[in-house]
C-alpha cells in the first residue's frame, strides 16, 4: 500500500503543526489523486491534534508505537513538514536509517547536510510538497534510490566510532593533551 508516515510527540507544538498541515492541507490533494493511499500519524498524545477526532479518509492515528521496525516496514515514505522549532532532527535521521525516502521542509532539514534530490526532498510550498508526496508514492524506484542514499549518508555521517575520534581530536587540539 502507498503509505505515508509522520512520527512525533504531539505534546510538542511544531509536531502538532506538522501533523495538522499533513492532514488538512496535503492529504486532501493526495487522496484526490490516490484514493488508496494511507497516512499514519503515529506518536504520543495524538489527542492534542485538532484533527484527531475527525474521520479523515485514509488517515490513522495509532498513538504510541512500540515496534518501529514493523511501522517502518509498512511505510513507503516519511513526511516531516516542520515549520518551526530547533534541535536535532532525529525523525529524519531515524527514517534515513530505515532507508525510507524523506519529504521535508527547509526548516525540517536544518542542521542535516543532506541534499535535496540526493538523500531527501525539500519543499516549502504546499502544492509542491503535495506533488512531491504523490511522485514518491507513485515511483517505487525513486523511493528506493532516495532511501538508500539517505541510509548510506546516515551510516557514514553519524558513525559512532568516527564521531568519537572526531571529538577526541577536538579535545586534543583544544587542551593539548593526548586522549
Task: Please provide the spans of the model-predicted regions.
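Short Ser/Thr-rich beta->loop micro-motif in glycosyltransferases that lines
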Residues: 63-64, 80-86, 107-108
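A short, well-ordered alpha-helix in the C-terminal region of glycosyltransferases
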Residues: 142-156, 163-169
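Acidic donor-binding loop of glycosyltransferase active sites
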Residues: 73-87, 98-101
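Glycosyltransferase donor-binding loop in the core domain
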Residues: 11-14, 87, 121, 155
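Conserved acidic donor-binding segment of nucleotide-sugar-dependent glycosyltransferases
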Residues: 120-127, 135-140
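Short acidic/histidine- and often glycine-rich active-site loop of Leloir-type glycosyltransferases
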Residues: 106-117, 121-122
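Conserved catalytic-core segment of nucleotide-activated headgroup transferases in glycan assembly
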Residues: 1-74
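Short hydrophobic beta-strand element within catalytic cores of glycosyltransferases
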Residues: 91-95, 101-105
Amino acid at each position: 500500500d502507498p503509505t505515508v508516515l509522520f512520527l512525533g510527540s504531539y505534546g510538542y507544538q511544531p509536531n502538532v503543526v506538522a501533523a495538522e498541515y499533513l492532514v488538512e492541507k496535503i492529504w486532501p490533494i493526495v487522496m484526490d489523486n490516490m484514493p488508496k493511499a494511507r497516512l499514519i500519524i503515529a506518536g504520543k498524545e495524538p489527542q492534542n491534534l485538532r484533527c484527531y477526532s475527525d474521520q479523515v479518509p485514509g488517515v490513522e492515528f495509532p498513538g504510541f508505537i512500540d515496534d518501529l521496525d514493523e511501522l517502518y516496514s509498512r511505510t513507503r515514505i516519511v513526511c516531516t513538514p516542520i515549520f518551526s522549532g530547533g534541535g536535532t532532527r532525529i525523525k529524519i535521521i531515524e527514517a534515513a536509517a530505515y532507508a525510507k525516502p524523506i519529504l521535508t521542509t527547509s526548516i525540517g532539514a536544518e542542521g542535516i547536510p543532506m541534499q535535496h534530490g540526493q538523500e531527501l526532498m525539500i519543499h516549502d510550498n504546499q502544492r509542491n510538497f503535495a506533488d512531491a508526496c504523490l511522485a514518491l508514492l507513485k515511483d517505487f524506484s525513486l523511493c528506493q534510490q532516495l532511501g538508500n542514499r539517505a541510509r548510506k549518508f546516515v551510516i557514514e555521517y553519524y558513525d559512532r566510532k568516527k564521531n568519537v575520534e572526531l571529538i577526541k581530536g577536538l579535545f586534543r587540539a583544544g587542551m593539548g593533551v593526548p586522549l
